[in-house]
């Protein structure tokens, strides 16, 4: 039997000061052009927390709106706030920056995150009201230290500053004098990713109703890497996040594949469960501070707010078949192989058409495709176009090429089988994963039967190969008893018969 998707959680962290101080577009600009007009104008384009919460794609990400409802809104969305928008959503929340800095400290096992005493005193009462973090996490927040000590660490000791509302409120210290892999900059990135994964895991426990000790394995699939100079990406971020999230009975490991990593991780998790190795596997990823404000130059130049101001995170729970939740069908897995090639048509053929043909299915047998769900509000002003729509056009074009669809039906195909994008451009975050929760619910509600989750990644960014990458799988309605009949087991009588026959054959061979 296949494994099933039992629950999903999605979280965002509003991080406006991290946009300014930690996003690589901004840190690079301060090196090459420190007096640029862009850096001067940037603060005027930063959104408030309330504005980020009321942003329709963000409300969609945490489950307060569906992709269909977002698609009914006229674009662009940045100047159309959602009335009555809330921090909490069906699948998670949008955490404010000040609370997240305390969560980063709680996620730090080596006393690297230091926070201002007054800032902690002001912020901790708000975090104590969080319904999902628990005293075991809150107890890890320290009382704080003097502002003068914080300023000295940043100005004289190579520490990386932590800011809120434009004010220095803490720092991340380096963990080694000469090891660049343990620099304050790298540790800040890793701790932010870890803390956002912790938040996603805590929400997953809530949405699933599963006890922390029931989760046996965690796969982390972000784009960060932790290690020292002797093993730069040694890991293990999965186990590190599981520790803080309270998953005391879990082990785990990391999966990397740029933007395709989540889909690789989902397939691996489903395989581990189907094989019986583990009963409950969580897949999670935190956000990327480096990508904050990645396209902000274009946004600022065009008079738009900086829309890449949130860290993204998610977690999904994959368990043994319960006869109810949607199956992850491992008989329909698309893969971009070494020999596939990198043309868009070759990529989509390998990920969509080929696995469906092997399963005796057609493209239009899939109700919804989820691929590269980047928010077009972000990508279109930056010149990258509408990325999800480009994917759905290519899939529709394949349907035309194979004779499934008339050319005149292409737009209708995109509307019926595609969707708008809503995910922040956090690399691994948009790549199919944000639709998992919505797909599960739509299948349970009888609104559809099959969705294909598509992960795509650009491996050339690591400068080790020019290869593209991708993997896909189908999430489908649970077939329950019907599947049992199609996959019968072997009865005890049949086993006894086979043993008896084997013994007779062995005896005959001995006589000869």
Per-range role (PLM):
Residues 275-310:
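Flexible, glycine-rich active-site loops centered on histidine and acidic residues
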Residues 193-209, 238, 344-360, 395, ...:
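Short, well-ordered amphipathic alpha-helical segments that serve as non-catalytic structural scaffolds
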């Amino acid at each position: 039997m296949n494994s099933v998707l039992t629950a999903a959680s999605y979280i965002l962290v509003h991080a406006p000061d991290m946009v300014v101080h930690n996003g690589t577009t901004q840190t690079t600009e301060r090196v090459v052009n420190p007096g640029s007009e862009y850096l001067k104008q940037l603060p005027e384009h930063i959104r408030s927390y309330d504005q980020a919460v009321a942003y329709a794609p963000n409300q969609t990400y945490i489950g307060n709106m569906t992709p269909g409802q977002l698609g009914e809104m006229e674009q662009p969305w940045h100047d159309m706030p959602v009335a009555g928008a809330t921090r909490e959503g069906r699948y998670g929340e949008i955490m404010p920056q000040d609370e997240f800095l305390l969560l980063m400290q709680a996620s730090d096992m080596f006393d690297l995150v230091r926070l201002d005493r007054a800032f902690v005193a002001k912020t901790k009462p708000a975090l104590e009201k969080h319904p999902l973090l628990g005293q075991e996490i809150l107890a890890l927040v320290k009382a704080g230290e003097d502002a003068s000590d914080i300023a000295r660490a940043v100005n004289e000791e190579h520490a990386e500053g932590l800011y809120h509302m434009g004010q220095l409120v803490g720092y991340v210290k380096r963990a080694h004098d000469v090891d660049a892999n343990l620099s304050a900059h790298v540790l800040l990135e890793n701790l932010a990713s870890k803390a956002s994964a912790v938040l996603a895991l805590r929400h997953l426990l809530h949405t699933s109703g599963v006890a922390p000790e029931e989760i046996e394995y965690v796969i982390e699939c972000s784009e960060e890497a932790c290690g020292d100079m002797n093993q730069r990406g040694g890991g293990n971020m999965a186990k590190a996040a599981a520790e803080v999230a309270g998953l005391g009975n879990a082990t785990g490991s990391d999966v990397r594949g740029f933007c395709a990593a989540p889909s690789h991780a989902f397939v691996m998790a489903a395989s581990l469960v189907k094989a019986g190795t583990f009963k409950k596997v969580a897949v999670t990823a935190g956000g990327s501070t480096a990508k904050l404000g990645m396209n902000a130059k274009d946004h600022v130049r065009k008079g738009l707010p900086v829309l890449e101001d949130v860290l993204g995170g998610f977690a999904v729970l994959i368990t043994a078949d319960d006869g109810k939740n949607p199956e992850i069908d491992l008989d329909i897995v698309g893969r971009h192989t070494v020999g596939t090639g990198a043309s868009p048509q070759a990529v989509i053929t390998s990920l969509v058409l080929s696995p469906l043909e092997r399963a005796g299915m057609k493209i239009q047998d899939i109700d919804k495709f989820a691929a590269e769900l980047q928010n077009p509000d972000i990508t279109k002003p930056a010149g990258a176009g509408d990325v999800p729509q480009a994917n759905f056009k290519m899939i529709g074009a394949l349907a035309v090429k194979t004779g499934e669809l008339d050319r005149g039906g292409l737009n209708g195909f995109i509307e019926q089988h595609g969707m708008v994008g809503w995910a922040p451009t956090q690399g691994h975050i948009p790549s199919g994963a944000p639709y998992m929760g919505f797909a599960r619910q739509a299948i349970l509600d009888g609104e559809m039967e099959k969705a294909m989750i598509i992960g795509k990644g650009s491996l050339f960014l690591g400068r080790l190969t020019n290869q593209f990458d991708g993997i896909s799988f189908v999430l489908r309605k649970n077939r329950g008893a019907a599947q049992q009949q199609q996959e019968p087991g072997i009865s005890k009588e049949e086993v006894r018969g086979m043993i008896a026959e084997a013994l007779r054959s062995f005896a005959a061979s001995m006589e000869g």
